[in-house]
């Protein structure tokens, strides 16, 4: 960098009746340049001064250009004004029946929508923030309040921040209610427009901070931490340094909430707090290393929650959600490497995906298993201490872990982050020995020639054996490869070796069994196993009562049903299995294991999806929606399947608690085709929040009766999603998920429509959706 910005001194003066603001900005510069170009989007620039004198400037739709030579010590003053955004990006308006809130979402390129800046993660600066607001409102930013002046209006000045990136700045204005507790000498504050029912989120935050301080050997850097509940929030949660924002559902969890909600809230809170070190204290130099932030926070969030809630068995969810989602996405030819060369801001939102989060986190788990937990921890701590308050690249982290472990981490990680996809290990009996080879796995049934150095783990009669596989390998014996599914690869056994594996099934962990099941399903979808072979193999697992095994089988059979509801083989297998599980699990018992409560909700929901008769049986229980929150979604979908839209609307208006309300909204997607058009009016009148459109449209497309509705209204759906979720990548994801289902019935039509609606911000989703369509069409014809 030839120059840098040392400090932004920003004052925002809000007109809360018109939802506009005026900004005064003082930028202190260091270094030299022939001109100053600041990112600036949808801002009206009133004046620019350099060292107190007016200067010429030029504005276009992307930047403010100040055509004067600059040098160290120069100060630029900018006056500007803008509207508070009505999207969910930048500095925007968030409304709820409890009130109105101004909030911010700046990752990845939203800061430029709020004030002129160099909106680049490597350009760290100190921020001095002052907010001018109405007297009956409160203000929150990254740092504690320095002073408040009140006359006609309230002027709130905050302490200066440490050096940090623009995307981590936070500004919040609202009539907040608070709860707080101290952790050591720091205050942890929960802020919400709604009444606060529990300090459960604060307790999770305190436990998370305690874990990270011990794990990293570095204290939390700021004097306070806000956990801020945002009524309308596209991103889900955001790690603004010292002022973390969440969707309301994450901070509404109480000790009495359903098992799923409590666990999801804990993992979400722990994820964002991990970023306070990994992302905020040390930040990637550019968005090509976004995965480093997100994958690490993802992996650490599960590790953290597991440290204080062993009963949840959260690494079962890690394997199912993070590793499983990444394996599925990364087996498409329209995948991308973990490390992506990002040039255009429109591309950034599309890499917030299963690869950046799930694959990256799974690779970190694989490396931790390879080098050992303690050397991995030491490497992380070394990396954070060396780059605190600065920027770093992936290679900096690998060097630190390699130094601590003495193992070739750099060489291994170079291959895994720069090559798209992953291997399948082929296991074949070769005389008295077993031969292991690798090839790249694709879900379309083809194979690639790319190879990886694989940290291989083998379960043998004598225990676990580890090695680095870089060529074909011969081994003398094995019970199973990929112990605890620690490696990011699949394993294809020939019949002889598969029989060996099955004969030892009772010796394996639930993570091992999940890996076998998940691989079997991938081999079915890709044509490597026939339907009959798949059915015969899955029979080995049907009597297993482990929660993860049951969840995986239920998910697979329900997915096959949704691909071809008319297949009697699939319908009968799915219905019989799910009915047996519902009967086995029975009703909720006092003091039962949270894993059982969560599992019951999953199998009930899957059976409601598959079996209309069960939906009719369960529908009357909709009246007791809040009695067992884990069953709320199943009961709501049952009501939707039995023409209960009006009752769903009443419930959506009745429940202010997002734990129930969001499930009711999502279930509306399973209403009959003639009722689905009501969804648009519910979005218009605010019954369905903008942030919750994603849920309802996702359910519409899994509903066999809703696919034609989605297709007929795809232009409107895309328009609504793009406006609300600008810069988040959610439109790309909804198209990726919907195109395959729609195309099973409207193959040529969806291909033509996809070509008409293409846009740089969601082309990736279209391409993945079309590729997945071709894959499941082949499967459809075999079912």
From Swiss-Prot:
Keyword Thylakoid: no
An example Gene Ontology biological process: proteolysis
Active site (record annotation): 272 (proton acceptor)
Annotated cofactor note: Binds 1 zinc ion per subunit.
Keywords assigned by UniProt, alphabetized: Aminopeptidase, Cytoplasm, Hydrolase, Metal-binding, Metalloprotease, Protease, Zinc
Entry's Gene Ontology molecular function annotations: metalloaminopeptidase activity; peptide binding; zinc ion binding
GO CC, one annotated term: extracellular space
Binding residues for Zn(2+): 271, 275, 294
Keyword Kinase: no
Subcellular localization(s) per the UniProt record: Cytoplasm
Function: Proteases F1, F2 and F3 degrade oligopeptides produced by Tricorn (themselves probably produced by the proteasome), yielding free amino acids.
Protein family per UniProt: Belongs to the peptidase M1 family.
PANTHER family per record: PROTEASE M1 ZINC METALLOPROTEASE, PUROMYCIN-SENSITIVE AMINOPEPTIDASE-RELATED
Subunit organization: Monomer. Part of the Tricorn proteolytic complex.
Designated name of the protein: Tricorn protease-interacting factor F2
Gene expressing this chain: trf2
